Amino acid sequence: MKLTTKEFERLMQTVSAGWNEGDARKAADCFSNDAIYVEPPDAQLYHGRAELYEFFGGDSGTDIPMKMTWHHLAFNEEEQIGFGEYTFKLHGQYHGIVVVRIESGLITQWREYQYRTEMNWEIFTSQNPF
């Protein structure tokens, strides 16, 4: 099953909604059972939906709320590879980009690059806003 761009956007919005709502199951269910989640080269590495569920807060949730905002999402329907530019807050604030591979409607690979900063998105991108 190949996702359309709209379905990809819905999937990515579901991940962020799960994080924003403190619902680890909602977010983890967007990933395949054998998903790989990495921040290269090895800042973060998680394997599989069960491990991601715990990373996302598990049954007890995170100690402070997560906040995820997508600024841009793009998707190649043929290759089933998508990108998202985001701001994430948990223990610090990060602006970054993630590249994902989709198979059978779920995220199988997640690779993120992020920059920790206290600047808001508008200031962070002020030299090249869009």
Placement of each model-derived feature along the sequence:
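Short, low-complexity N-terminal intrinsically disordered segments enriched in polar/charged residues
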Residues: 1-33, 127-130
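A beta-strand edge to alpha-helix "cap/lid" segment located at domain peripheries
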Residues: 2, 53-130
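Small side chains
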Residues: 18, 27, 35, 82-84, ...
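Short, hydrophobic secondary-structure boundary micro-motifs
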Residues: 28, 38-39, 67-69
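Short hydrophobic/aromatic segments of transmembrane alpha-helices and their interfaces
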Residues: 34-36, 90-91
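A short gly/proline-enriched turn/hairpin at secondary-structure junctions
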Residues: 36-45, 61-63
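Short beta-edge strand/loop motif at the mouth of beta-sheet-based domains
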Residues: 43-54
